Amino acid sequence: MHRLYKKTITYLLSKDFLVTLLVLSIMLAIFWYMLWASQLSRRTILIDTLPDFTIYFTFGIVLGLIFAGRALYSRSVKKKLKHMLEMFLYGFVLGFLSIVNIFDVYVYLFPDDVISYTSDYKIVFPGPSTGKSSRCEAGIWVKDIHTGQFKQLCTNREILFKKRRQGMDALWITARVNKLGTYIVDYRFTYK
């Protein structure tokens, strides 16, 4: 028993275990960030002129080139090209996915102002997509005054029944805004 305990302690303090723990922690943090940022993007409206996809793609290519450059020095000549291509692909995917919602996060974290306004709305069934194969029960289309764009928000029949009364034909929207877009904090049904 003492021998097993000693081996376990030795392994837990080894460099391999600590490196594995560090890599898993970083990957878990990236995964958490991607989930959090994708939730933010459901209520964020970016301006039309922002070349977001080009920036995501460029960042992925740059990170892929960094990974491929690092791989250039680590393999023998026979497998070098294949390893470089694999590392480029890994770097590209990691870079692309980790930055894909960065502008939504920026709008959420760094608002220049908080505004409130009324907007017309339209309720549709079913609502926006919430994943690969699921959808919200209902959706509310609203027009953002700051960007001039329409956004579909997720809701359900129960919320509509509780919060909406006959004759309520507008939404009172509270939003955080900056030069890149709008994050809708809250909305309430109201009378015009």
Tell where the protein language model's regions lie, with residue ranges:
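Short, Lys/Arg-rich, polar N-terminal cytosolic tail immediately upstream
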Residues: 1-11
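Membrane-interface helix-boundary motifs at transmembrane edges
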Residues: 12, 44-47, 73-85
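Membrane-embedded alpha-helical segments of integral membrane proteins
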Residues: 15-72
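Internal/C-terminal transmembrane anchor helices
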Residues: 79-106
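Structural detector for short beta-strands of small beta-barrel domains
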Residues: 111-134
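OB-fold (S1/OB) nucleic-acid-binding surfaces
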Residues: 129-154
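Short nucleic-acid-contacting surface segments enriched for D/E, G, S/T with interspersed K/R
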Residues: 156-174
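OB-fold/S1-family single-stranded nucleic acid-binding modules
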Residues: 176-192
